Amino acid sequence: MNPLIQSLTEGQLRTDIPAFRPGDTVRVHAKVVEGTRERIQIFEGVVIARKGAGISETYTVRKISNGIGVERTFPIHTPRVDKIEVVRYGKVRRAKLYYLRALQGKAARIKEIRR
């Protein structure tokens, strides 16, 4: 990577991010601005992908809300995310879990591993 770009992005990298992988269930505390107020919105779901590297790394979280699948993509190093909690560690053999989009109910479950 270009040393100039690397030196600019070093100060913006967050160090309070827990180690999580695709298949893990996470609880993301995102800051949401509504008018003049700012509040914390919790989004809990399964991590189905992690993409990129460095300052531009992102992850996608999927949950089922009222029978409808909802996915949100968050940058890892954004200040808009207050904190990330790992709720459960999942055992998967893929880096991208896009096949979960086609599964429903108990078929969409992921086996849990103890850490």
Curated annotation (Swiss-Prot):
The record lists its disulfide bonds as none
- Any GO molecular function: structural constituent of ribosome
SUPFAM superfamilies (alphabetical): Translation proteins SH3-like domain
- Gene Ontology cellular component annotations, sorted alphabetically: cytosolic large ribosomal subunit
Gene Ontology BP term (one): translation
Q: Which Gene3D superfamilies match?
A: 2.30.30.790
Q: Could you tell me which InterPro entries the record lists for this protein? A: Ribosomal_bL19 (IPR001857), Ribosomal_bL19_CS (IPR018257), Ribosomal_bL19_sf (IPR038657), Translation_prot_SH3-like_sf (IPR008991)
Q: Keywords for this entry? A: Ribonucleoprotein, Ribosomal protein
Instruction: State the function annotated in the UniProt record.
Output: This protein is located at the 30S-50S ribosomal subunit interface and may play a role in the structure and function of the aminoacyl-tRNA binding site.
As for family, the record states: Belongs to the bacterial ribosomal protein bL19 family.
Task: Name it.
Answer: Large ribosomal subunit protein bL19
The organism encoding this protein is Streptococcus sanguinis (strain SK36)
